[in-house]
A protein has these predicted regions:
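Beta1-alpha1 glycine-rich phosphate/pyrophosphate-binding loop at the start
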Residues: 2-93, 98, 177-178, 184-216
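FAD-binding core/adjacent interface of flavoenzyme oxidoreductases
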Residues: 2-23, 90-178, 196-201
Length: 216
């Protein structure tokens, strides 16, 4: 990141591009990368604009805890404006980027253009289904609060449906959770599911034993 920040200056800009005004750095994305870039520019001789389609910064490493009902969404989200409130040279725009006019040096939103001298694109990454895009229709990613609350609803609903079922095979199916991906998020989610089943839900049901739930 420090190497990136070093390149955000007026080097290579023509006098017409800067003139007598302050350099304007536009950052698309208010995730870890975008906010780190913005805060590194706190003392810079220029103005910073952060654009994001959501008004909050999300601590994604703890999304699995929201998905398993250990935390609420508010516990892992903070207002972007609040984070940058004391940074005098920073401005925040809530909006979705529809395009970039490279020649005209402008970021395009639905109803406005935001001119820039330097542009940082920090929009993050999407889920990978390892070449099996059909999985997207039957599963949920874990990148946003909406993803986490959807997953939480599905998990808790599976226990409820298992409680209502008289079919042992149906119960087994409902209490089996498949996790695609064995990285930190996948491993932590599997552990949190086990904790949910064996501790939080262990005594909540009459007809099923939540501790028999399995993840793979």
């Amino acid at each position: 990141m420090d190497g990136l920040i070093e390149r955000i200056d007026t080097t290579g800009l023509t006098p017409a591009a800067v003139g007598n005004r302050r350099t304007h750095v536009v950052i698309i994305g208010a995730g870890f990368g975008g906010l780190t870039a913005a805060m590194h520019l706190k003392q810079a001789e220029g103005d910073v604009t952060v654009i994001d389609r959501r008004n909050h910064h999300l601590f994604q490493p703890l999304l699995y805890q929201v998905a398993t009902a250990a935390l609420s969404p508010a516990d892992i989200a903070a207002p972007v404006r609040g984070i940058l409130a004391r940074q005098a040279n920073a401005n925040v725009i809530l909006g979705e980027v529809t395009g970039i006019d490279v020649t005209g040096r402008a970021v395009l939103l639905a109803e406005r253009r935001v001119s820039y001298d330097q542009l940082v694109i920090a929009t993050g990454a999407r889920e990978s289904y390892f070449g099996h895009d059909e999985w997207a229709a039957v599963t949920s990613g874990l990148k946003t609060i909406e993803d986490a609350t959807t997953m939480r609803r599905r998990i808790l609903l599976a226990f409820e449906r298992a409680e209502d079922s008289d079919d042992p095979e149906e119960r087994r199916r409902l209490l089996t959770f498949v996790i695609i991906g064995g990285g930190p998020t996948g491993v932590e989610l599997a552990g949190a599911l086990a904790e949910l089943a064996r501790a939080a839900l262990a005594r909540d049901f009459r007809r099923i034993d939540p501790t028999t739930a399995a993840s793979s």
